[in-house]
């Protein structure tokens, strides 16, 4: 059956290739282990204008490779497209000790595509192993990694940018700007990759990331003495990123960037003029940013529709920004603030802000069927309008309560809230605290803008307003009220804008709501 499968697959691939393309079949014997092989591995160099296709008939493992030449690698392409057709085999690189551009695969010609497709397991670990290495995959053309069961990039280094994948656009080049497309892979991991430039894991002009299973960018790091950003991913000036989660969750956690000895958490950095084209997840899936997004100043403001539908396919999942994974000493504004300088519309599903984060946008609006959830201490900050249709606030604790904030900064900006729903954590042991024996009030929500006329508050609702604990130890109900405050000076003598505050009051020993 395996022989028949290989024959049919290879025949189909062969028919799809240009007539003059070079086809190379790879067997287990094409692997290499420098720990037991005294002979140096000769680079596989291709230069066919019509393209080269490597078709796998067996698993191929390449490990413990050491090259003394500065420009050496394992696979080097100098002309035409380069295809690696996996045929459900394993293809792994491990412990590559080389300093060439792209220790594993180097595609050195623009306006081409490097494709790795249909593998059971595709892995680049410590490839390269050395800090002076220059990344696992380097391509002047576009890179496509697709339809594989498991794809892993772990522990790779680059003395330039993008320790896992780097697709630079060379100044003066007449080639089109390269892109990276990661699509249809069922398990995708980028972990512990380190670069000395932009993008700890990936640096490219355009990135399309479409996941079909659990995926993560974890503990990647970018550092430089002068200029560094994009702990996991860096998007070049004028570029774009599109994220679509079709199954499972996509998680960004523990990614950092350092400059001048200062280390901050960062998942994705958009350089000047770069933009999100899509940010979406299907129902019961999500994108979780435990590290912030950063965005260089942009003179052109573009639209971003979060959870935008695609034809008949809807996206009703969760896009989450959270400070949950920060250690106590890491809690600061830089590690909690995500910036996307675009006009954002929430089309469906849930946008969640939790654990003290701030989300800074150019403007925000949402469709009525979508939900914005904010936990105490979080902020939605917009230069322009902040038009919120449906806000949910979950109360877990009333001690040291910090209000939710929605703020618009421009002089003509508007803050509007159509519906506010306040819910309480499902456990009731909280009511055993002594403060519930007496009435108290906490500031729940602050709307801040240029004037009273710019702050519009609509319907407010409470879940479980009536509370009765076991043995009637605590009885009472919650209520909402609001007040307006003119501009003032805070304790640091900074101007606080016009404010409308919604208060949450606990009323004890009441047997029925008034």
From Swiss-Prot:
**Example of a GO cellular component annotation carried by this entry:** extracellular region
InterPro entries, A to Z: Pectin_lyase_fold/virulence, Polymorphic_membr_middle, POMP_repeat
Q: Check the UniProt entry and state the signal peptide residues, or none.
A: 1-21
Membrane-spanning segments: none
Protein name per UniProt: Probable outer membrane protein pmp12
Q: Which family does it belong to?
A: Belongs to the PMP outer membrane protein family.
Q: Where in the cell is it found?
A: Secreted, Cell wall; Cell outer membrane
Q: Which Pfam families match?
A: Chlam_PMP, ChlamPMP_M
What's the name of its gene? pmp12
Question: Can you tell which superkingdom this protein's organism belongs to?
Answer: Bacteria
Q: Which organism is it from?
A: Chlamydia pneumoniae
NCBIfam families in the record: POMP_repeat
């Amino acid at each position: 059956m395996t022989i028949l499968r290989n024959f049919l697959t290879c025949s189909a691939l062969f028919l799809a290739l240009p007539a003059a393309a070079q086809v190379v079949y790879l067997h287990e014997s094409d692997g290499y282990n420098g720990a037991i092989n005294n002979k140096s591995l000769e680079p596989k160099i291709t230069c066919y204008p019509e393209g080269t296709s490597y078709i796998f008939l067996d698993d191929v493992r390449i490990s413990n490779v050491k090259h003394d030449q500065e420009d050496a690698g394992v696979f080097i392409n100098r002309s035409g497209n380069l295809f690696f057709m996996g045929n459900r085999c394993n293809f792994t690189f491990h412990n590559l000790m080389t300093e060439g551009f792209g220790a594993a695969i180097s595609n050195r010609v623009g306006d081409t595509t490097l494709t790795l497709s249909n593998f059971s397991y595709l892995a680049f670990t410590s490839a390269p192993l050395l800090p002076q290495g220059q990344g696992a995959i380097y391509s002047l053309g576009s890179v496509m990694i697709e339809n594989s069961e498991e794809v892993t990039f772990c522990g790779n280094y680059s003395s330039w940018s993008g320790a896992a994948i780097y697709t630079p656009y060379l100044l003066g080049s007449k080639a089109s700007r390269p892109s990276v497309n990661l699509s249809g892979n069922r398990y995708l991991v980028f972990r512990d990759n380190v670069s000395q430039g932009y993008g700890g894991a990936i640096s490219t002009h355009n990135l399309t990331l479409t996941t079909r299973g659990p995926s993560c960018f974890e503990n990647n790091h970018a550092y430089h003495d002068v200029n560094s950003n994009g702990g996991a991913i860096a998007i070049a000036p004028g570029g774009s990123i599109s994220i679509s989660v079709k199954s499972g969750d996509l998680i960004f956690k523990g990614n950092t960037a350092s400059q001048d000895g200062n280390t901050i958490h960062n998942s994705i950095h958009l350089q000047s003029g770069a933009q999100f084209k899509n940010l979406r997840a299907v129902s019961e899936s999500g994108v979780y940013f435990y590290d912030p997004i950063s965005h260089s100043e942009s003179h052109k403001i573009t639209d971003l529709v979060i959870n935008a539908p695609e034809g008949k396919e809807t996206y009703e999942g969760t896009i989450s920004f959270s400070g949950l994974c920060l250690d106590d000493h890491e809690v600061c504004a830089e590690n909690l603030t995500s910036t996307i300088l675009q006009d954002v519309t929430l089309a469906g599903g849930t946008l969640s802000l939790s654990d003290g984060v701030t989300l800074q946008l150019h403007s925000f609006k949402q469709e009525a069927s979508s939900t914005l959830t904010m936990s105490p201490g979080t902020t939605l900050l917009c230069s322009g309008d902040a038009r919120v249709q449906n806000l949910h606030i979950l109360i877990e604790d009333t001690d040291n309560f910090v209000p939710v904030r929605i703020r618009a900064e421009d002089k003509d900006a508007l803050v509007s809230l159509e519906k506010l729903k306040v819910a309480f954590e499902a456990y009731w042991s909280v009511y055993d605290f002594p403060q519930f024996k007496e009435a108290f009030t906490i500031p729940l929500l602050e709307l801040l803008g240029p004037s009273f006329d710019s702050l519009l508050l609509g319907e407010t609702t409470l879940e479980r307003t009536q509370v009765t604990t076991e043995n009637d130890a605590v009885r009472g109900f919650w209520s909402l009220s609001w007040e307006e405050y003119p501009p003032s000076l805070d304790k640091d003598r900074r101007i606080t804008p016009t404010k409308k505050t919604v208060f949450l009051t606990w009323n004890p020993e009441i047997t029925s709501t008034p």
